C-alpha cells in the first residue's frame, strides 16, 4: 500500500477523498483536544473527566465531520462520472475538502485565545462578535497579537497543504455503477444525517 500512496495511477474508491479527509480531520480534532486538555488539565482532573472528554469529543467530532462532509459525499455518489460534470464536481470537491479542513484548523487555532478571553470554546459568541470587526480587530491586536500571527501563518500553510492533499485524494477516483448509486446514496444519507 505505501508504495502507491503518492503515485498517480492507482484507482481509488469513489468515497476515498471523503474518508481520507475525515481521518485527517479526526486526527486534527484529537490532537487539538489533547493539547487543550493538557493545558487545562486541572479543570479536567477536577471533574474526573478524561475518559468522558475524549469519548464525547470523538462522538462530536464524528457528528461534525458527517455534517461537513455528508453533502459532498452524497453529491460525489450522485454526480461523479468520467465526463465533464464529473471533472467539474472533482474541482468542487477538492475546494470543499480544502475549505472545510482549513476551517477546522482555523477554529482549533482560535480556541486557546478564545478560552483565555471568554473561558469557553468558540461558540455563537465567536460568530456574533464578527459583526463588530473594528472592535474585534483592535482587541486581537492588543491582547493576542502573537496568536493572530501564528494562526494566520499556520492557516496559510494549511491552505497549501490541504489543497495539495485534496488534489491527490480526488485524482483517479473510479466512478460507481449507476445501479449501486441509489443504495450508496441512501447509506450516505443514513450515516451522515440521521
Language-model-detected regions and their locations in the chain:
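Transmembrane and membrane-interface helices of multi-pass
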Residues: 2-194
